[in-house]
Regions:
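Catalytic cores of alpha/beta
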Residues: 24-29, 69-74, 116-122, 137-152, ...
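Short, structured coil segments at secondary-structure junctions
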Residues: 31-32, 50, 78-79, 97-98, ...
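Ligand-binding grooves and catalytic loops that recognize ribose/phosphate and carbohydrate rings
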Residues: 43-55, 60-77, 123-126, 161-168
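Hydrophobic faces of well-ordered beta-strands that scaffold small-molecule active sites
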Residues: 13-18, 34-36, 54-58, 83-84, ...
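Conserved N-terminal beta1-alpha1 strand-loop-helix module at the mouth
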Residues: 1-53, 57, 62-64, 79-80
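Active-site-adjacent beta->alpha loops and helix N-cap segments on the catalytic face
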Residues: 3, 40-51, 63-68, 85-99, ...
């Protein structure tokens, strides 16, 4: 597995989260966007044709249950570069299949925070995504305690939210 995903995030840390066809059309026109989180439908080919890295949220794919077999299906039947999931077992499977991985956490309380600190060592995702992303102080603290790069997602509603998350 190469470093294309890592390099793309490093070059432009703003990641498009595509939830509709309108989002998809707009995203594919933006040259600065290099990584796309796919949160709906069967659009990997269009994302790849636009020269972007396609990360599929395996938990949200209609018709597939979020199990290891779904990760195998994505690897064998699509051009997806990687997966996003809340399930550590799917991250492990994706790593075995040389897919990029983003482990998504809903950071609701201190127990969820402690889970991140514990699981990052056993699961070893490429990135950890924390939601909501509009928590720069918590994200900054987390970044100082773990080695896995952190992506801030959810509730990023304006430029101030983007800048707060990026500086964290």
């Amino acid at each position: 597995m190469g470093r294309e995903f890592w390099n793309a995030v490093e070059e432009n840390p703003i990641i498009a989260a595509v939830k509709s066809m309108d989002d998809l059309e707009q995203c594919c026109k933006l040259e600065d966007i290099r990584v796309v989180f796919i949160l709906f439908g069967d659009i990997v080919k269009k994302i790849k044709a636009a020269g972007k890295i396609a990360m599929v949220h395996v938990d949200l794919i209609g018709g597939l249950s979020p199990r290891e077999i779904a990760v195998e299906y994505l690897k064998n039947n699509t051009d997806a570069d990687g997966i996003i999931t809340t399930k550590p077992s799917l991250i492990k499977k994706a790593k075995e299949l040389s897919l990029y991985t983003v482990l998504r956490y809903f950071l609701l309380d201190s127990m969820a925070y402690e889970n991140i600190l514990t699981q990052q060592h056993t699961v070893r995702p490429d990135f950890i995504e924390v939601l909501p992303g509009a928590m720069p102080k918590v994200i900054q603290k987390l970044c100082s305690e773990i080695k896995v790069p952190v992506i801030a997602g959810g509730l990023i509603i304006d430029k101030e939210s983007v800048m707060g998350a990026l500086t964290a």
